[in-house]
Amino acid sequence: MTTTQSAMRMVEGDHIKNWQASSDSGIFGSLDMAVEDLGFLMKRNRLDSGDQTGKFPSRSESAPPSMEGSFAALRNLLKQQEGSSSEVLSRAIENYDSEEEIRSDPAYVAYYLSNINLNPRLPPPLISRENQHLLRHFGDNNQSPTTSWDNMGIRSSLHSSRTALSTHREEPEDEASSGEQQSYASLAGRRKSIADMIQEDFPLTLSSVFKRPHSAGNRPIAQDIHAISSDTSSEHARRLPESDINSVNLLRETDSLSSDAIASEDPFTTDLASQSFTNAQTERLNARQASHEDNNLSVFGASPPSSVASRMRRNQEDQQSQGRRMPPQYTPSSYQVQASSPQQMSYPRIGGTQDMMQSLPKIATGEVHSTFQSPHGLAPPPMYTSTAAYMTSLSPFYHQNFQSSGMFVPQYNYGGYPPASGIVPQYMSGYPSHEATVPMPYDISSTSSGYNNPRLLPGVSSSGQNIPSLVDPFQLQYFQQAQVDAYAPPFQSSTDSFGQKDQQAVGYMANHEPLNSPLSPGYGLQSPRHMGNYFAVPPGVRVMPQYPGSPLASPVMPSSPVGGMMSHFGRRSETRYHQQGPSRNTGIYPGGWQGNRGGASSIVDDLKRHSFLDELKSPNARKLELSDIAGRVVEFSVDQHGSRFIQQKLEHCSDEEKASVFSEVLPQASKLMTDVFGNYVIQKFIEHGTPAQREELVKQLAGQMVSLSLQMYGCRVIQKALEVIDVDQKTELIRELDGNVLKCVRDQNGNHVIQKCIESMPAGRIGFVIAAFRGQVATLSTHPYGCRVIQRILEHCSDDEETHCIIDEILESAFALAHDQYGNYVTQHVLERGKPDERRQIIEKLTGNVVQMSQHKYASNVVEKCLEHADSTEREFLIEEIMGKSEEDNHLLAMMKDQFANYVVQKVLEISKDQQREILVQRMKIHLQSLRKYTYGKHIVARFEQLFGEESEVSEEGTEG
C-alpha cells in the first residue's frame, strides 16, 4: 500500500488516542483519520528503540515504499546524524503524539527541506513558506549559533532560543483572553499564510486583499507565531524533568520581555505613552500582564519569580534614563503605537493638539508611525511589531516612497491615508520646525508665538476643522518637492525665513542637483511663482503645492502671495514679454515676497488674454477686432498669432483704429523693433501708417541706427524705412553710419543695410560709403558679405566717376579674384555688366592660363563667362588655346575628362562656329569611345550627340569598319 495525498487507515490497534476535534474538521475531515493512524504508528514504532527492522512486513523490492519503510529509513538516517538537526527531530518525535505536531515543529521543517529530494513522499510541513520566513526573521536578532532545548534534556524547536518579537496587546477589562485556553491542535489543523493571520488580527482592514473568511480566533499575529514556535511546547511541559524547569522559566521570562528588551537596545528609542489611556488603566494593564506571566510560569510547577515585576520596572527606568540622554532636538517616540480597539486610537503627546484630536475620525486600524531622527540622518529600521500595521499603513516595506529620492520617510502617517498628509502636521505647533525635521507639505510649526495655539490660525476653527484635502499619491511625482537638509540643527537657519542660504549648502546643491530638473527651477530663494501656498518656510525650500497658485485659493493662509497663473501641476503661464520694465512686477508683501502685478485682477487679465490668443489659433473662432485687444497690443505684438492678427488688421483698418493701436505701440517701439514678431508690426506701420506716424517712427530710429543695423530684426525695420521714406529722411538717417561702414559691411545683418543704402539712394548721397571702400576692394571682394556690397556698387554706381576707383582695383586683382570662392563672383559681374574695355582687360589677364583655370573649381566659371561675353576675336584666341596648336597636344582630352573643365569644353561646343567647330568635332570623334568609360567624359559624349548626332553615328560606323 502506498501513501497518497490524504492519509489512509493502514493499521488498527488498541493504542489509538482520541484527539480533540479540530475546528477545521469540516474542511479537513480526512486529516483526523490520518492523525489517529500516524499516532498509532509512532507509538508502535519508537525511533529511539533498538533494531526493529524485522517487525516491518517483508515487501518486494519492486514495490513502492510504504509508510513503515519511510519511518525505518528515517530512523537509520537519524542514527547516522547525531548532533545535527535530525537528532532534535528524533527527540521531538518521541514526545509528539500526532502528525500535526510533528509537521508543525520547525525541526521537521528543516528536515523536510533537506530531505525532500531523497524522499518525495514525505508529508509537507504545516508551517507555510511565508510563516517559515517570518519565523526565521524573528530569530535573526540572535547572532549566536542556534541552540536547542534538547541540550538540556527537553524537546523544543530549532528557533526557540532566538529572540521573538512579541506584540503587546491591550484589551478592555471585561474581555477575557480565550485564545490561550483553546487547543493548539486547531491552529495546526491547516496551513495559515501571512494574509490569513493578518485578517484574523485586523478584521476591519480597509484593503480588500485580506477580506477572506477565517475560522480562528481574533488573536494578534504575534500570538499565532508564538503558538507555532514556542507555546506548543508548553502543552507538554509536564513531560519535562524537574531539573530543567528553571531554564525553561528563564526562557519564558526572556520571551515575555522580548519587546521591552529590543526597545531598550536602541539608545535613542523610548516608549510613547498613549493619550487614550489613563494612569490607572496603565497600572491595571501591567498587573494583568504580570499575572499572565505568573500563570505561564505556574504551568511548569514553579512559583512565580518576584523578579519579573522588578525587571519590568528596571527596564522602564533604563528607558527613561536613555530618554534623558537623548539630544534635545529628538522627540521621544516609539516606532509604533497600536490601537487595539476600533473605538480607541493612540496619538503622540504633542502640545497644542488636544482640541484638534477631538475632531479627528476614529480610525480602526489607525497607527502613528514616528520616524525617529537618528544622528546620521537615517531612520532606524522598523520592527515587525505588527505585519498588518505595516501593510495597512504606508510603510516603505510594503509601499513605494512617493516622495523624491532626496526626501526622508514622512514624520507621521495614518493607515489608509496618503503619505505625509496634512491632517496632523499642519496644527502641530509644538513640533520642531523645518530646520530640524523632515519637510512636510504644510508648515507644522510657526516662527511666532501667535501660531502656537490652533485657535489663532487664520481660517481654522478651534476644533481643527477646515482640514485641507489630501494629496493624490499618484500625482506626487508632478509636485515640487522640498529640498533642504531635513535633519540639520535648528541653529543653522535661525535667521529670517527669507534670508540668504548658507553658502556651503548653495554650493553643494549647485553641484549635486541638475539645473534642468523640471521640479527644480533654481536654487536659493525661490520666487512666489515657483512656490505654492506656504508660509514661514526656510530659505530656499520648495514645497509641494496642493492648491492653485492664487491668494484666494488657500483656506489656511489667505494672505499667502502667489504670482502668475499656476496650473494644477504647478506650471506657470506667464507672458514672454512684459510691458512695464523689470521692476513693474514688484509688489508689497509681508516677508519680502514679490507679488504679481495687479493681484487677482491680473489673473483675470491673463485669462482674458490667453482666451483671445486661443481664439486666434482656432480656425472656427469668432471674428476679433483691434478694439478687442485694446490695452494689450504690445503683448499681442510679441506673440506669433497676435502679431499676424495686428498686421492683417492694419492693412485695412480705419485711421482711428490705427491711431489707437499706434498710441500703444509707439512707447515700446524701440523694443518691438528688435523682437522676433514685434518688428513686423513696426514694419507694417511704416508701410501702411500715415505720414505723421512714419515720421514718429523715424524719430525712434534716430540715434540707434548702428545698433539696429547690427541686430537681426532691427536691420529689417531700417531696410523697410529706407524703402518708404523720402530721400531727405534717408540721408539724415544713414549719416549715422559714417565711420561704421566697414563694420556694417562685414556684419551678417549690417551688410543688408549698406546694400539697401546703395540701392535706394543716389551715388552722390552715399559718397562716404564709396569712400570707405577705397583701398579695401580686393579684400572686401573676397569677404562673404563684402562681395555682395561690391556687386551692388557695380550694379547701381558704375557710371559715376566716384566708382572708377573700385573697378580699377578689381581689374588689377582679376586673376587672383578669379580663383577665390567669393571674388570670382565679382570678376564675373564685371564681365557681365562691365564696359567692353573692362572685359578686354580681364581676358588679357587670363590669356595663357585658360587650360589651367578651366580645371579650377572657381576659375572655370570665369573662363565660361569669358567665352560667353568676349567678342569673336577674343573668343578665337581662347578656343585655340584650349584645342592646342596640333593634334599631339592632349589639352582637349584632359579637359574632357576633368570634373570642372568638361563644362568649359561643352561651352566651346555651343559657341564655336565654322572652321573652329569642324576642327573641334574631328578631334573629339577620335576619343568618343574612350570617353564613355569616364564619369565626366559621358557628359561630353551626351552633349556631342545632342549637337552632332548624325555625324557622330557616321563616325562610329567608320571606326568599326
Curated annotation (Swiss-Prot):
Main localization of the protein described in the UniProt heading: cytoplasm
UniProt keywords, alphabetically: Cytoplasm, Phosphoprotein, Repeat, RNA-binding, Translation regulation
GO molecular function: mRNA binding; single-stranded RNA binding
Gene3D superfamilies on file: Leucine-rich Repeat Variant
Residue(s) carrying Phosphoserine: S193
Description of its domains: The pumilio repeats mediate the association with RNA by packing together to form a right-handed superhelix that approximates a half donut. The number as well as the specific sequence of the repeats determine the specificity for target mRNAs.
The protein's name in its UniProt record: Pumilio homolog 5
Annotated organism of origin: Arabidopsis thaliana (Mouse-ear cress)
Taxonomic lineage from the root: Eukaryota, Viridiplantae, Streptophyta, Embryophyta, Tracheophyta
